[in-house]
Amino acid sequence: MRKSGFFPRLALVNLMRNGRFYGPYLLSCGMTAAMYYILSYLTFSDIVASVRGAGYLQSLMYLGRLVVTLFSAVLLLYANSFVMKRRRRELGLYNILGLEKRHTARLMVWETLYCAAAAIVGGLAAGVLLSKLVLLLLLQLSHLPVEYGFEISLSGMADTAALFGFLFLLTLVWNLFGLLRSRPVELLHSASAGEREPRTRRLLVVLGAVTLGAGYATALTVEDPFTALAYFFLAVALVMVGTYCLFTAGSIALLKHLRNSPRYYYQPKHFTAVAGLLYRMKQNAVGLANICILSTMVLVTVSTTVSLYAGLEGALERMYPYDVDVVQSLDEVPPEQETTLNEDTLERVQAAAADAGRKVELLQWSTPGDTVGYYTGNTFTLVAQEGVSTEIRLLTADDYGRLTGHTVDLEPEEVLVQAENLDLPDTFYIEDLPFHIAGTIMDFPRYNSSILISGQTAQLFLVVADETVVSAISDRDASRVHREFRVQVDLDGTEEEKLAFVDPLLAADANDVYSVISHQDNAVNLYTMYGGFLFLGVFLGLLFLLSTVLIIYYKQISEGYEDQRRYQIMQQVGMSPREVRSSIRSQVLLVFFLPLVTAGIHVAAAFPMLCKLLELFNLFDVCLFALCAAGTLLVFCAIYALVYGLTTRTYSRIVGGQ
């Protein structure tokens, strides 16, 4: 026993002999280690730090590292618990054959060292090899210039080795703790230990139905983006609780109902499948719920990020309809100086275009105003209170006519209205000022907005008679109506040439002379942000998919070993191999596709809420999101079916004793 090299050799033999268990375990550990290194590399990369919009990318990659850290811990602990459960009989035999617990502990230490070395070294090697390819993909998605060269992140390698070294140490401590508390006889029989038939817990079924229904109702009845944001995590929590309750208690109730149906139950393929699932449903239900939740996470994460990226051009056109929007605040400007200041701002814009050698294709200006009102009944109150929070934008008839070419003549109490998410009567009030709707319009001038997330619940665009009406509204607003002079410009030339026009204006913007909102400048930032969203969404989707596949694989292996003796007995009492295969197919179909169908239902129920959340990022194209969600579901189903085929063969080989 004291010969050096005995335990290292025995540990290596054990790992190779149990390759069916340790192979997927080490592959998953290595893949998560590679993913963690790649995200660390992108977080600390000098190449990423040098590109425009680096702050967005590095923040997103850091967030991704946190998610991968959490899932790596869960994945390793889950896989380790499965592997050790399958090996308990083997460890018990070691004790019966003369090995003491301290010897078994040494064996576990060596096995953990081998696993850690293989996973960390393999993961780092794969991460280093793939890091440049992933970086090029990220830069391409973000519309950033491709940087050539190769670098290795030593800090990323150190972080990866430290994290996974700690996780393997944690699994070792857990395994040793279980070994110390066990007895040899328990280890010999634990792998085949069954469970009592679970009872039908009606209270849990009711709780699951109520929480799932409440989560669905919350998602289906949400009316505006900010309410969706406020209740999103509550809805997620309710659906998760409902899923676990119904899979745990509801599945048992369903199986017992099937057992009480003689026409269905007393068929060999159904009899063995239902009886087996019912006997071990407590364990199976949690695994099925985990698969369902992870599948839902994959579908939601990938579909939302893909749709955001696909709808980016539309969002840019809505947020930045002009190449350049120069904004001069008039809040602190005396009325007698407004004309001079406005003319000076207009001259600066024209001079910048001349200096850049650009032809001005569109030049227009106006003096809009905006405030926030809270609509109740037929009145907007300009002090925060209960009511529909509404962004109110004001434009005089003269400015509206100059911008649109439509001449309008309004009385002081008349307005033209364009409303979004708001229904108004023919006469409404702003504080005590009455306004009569003289007509509705659909062409209220748009302005560039530097705000990514949408503003208030509703928007109201008003064309008023003249500045006296704006002043009257401002007098009733404690915070005053925000007034500004805006110059919109469209230019000829390439994107780079338009950015060159913006640079001197941005320099003046830095001195607080005025603010400049550039379509091209913000397009760079948004492509960086949305490209990072898409990259991270797909990256995390792969992580969730890996977790799903691993749980499915281990679950089916566990089922196969537990069913092996049962099916052998069934063949001995008269079942044909064809009947055995049919019964296996019936059980595997139920185990596999119930979580997938449920995940699809979850996504369908969440669709209205997700649409509202996407509106916060200026994605209003519901059809686009529906297509992206459907495409994601189809791809996921194809992968799911592939895993199903592979797992069915593995399950069949185990049951057949191969």
Map each language-model feature to its residues.
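N-terminal Sec/SRP start-transfer signal
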Residues: 1-33, 197-202, 211, 246-295, ...
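Short helix-loop junctions at transmembrane helix boundaries
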Residues: 41-54, 124-156, 214-230, 595-657
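Basic-flanked hydrophobic alpha-helices used for secretion and membrane insertion
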Residues: 315-546
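Alpha-helical transmembrane segments
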Residues: 35-63, 233, 249-252, 285, ...
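Peri-transmembrane interface segments
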Residues: 20-27, 35-67, 82-85, 93-94, ...
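Hydrophobic alpha-helical segments
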Residues: 114-258
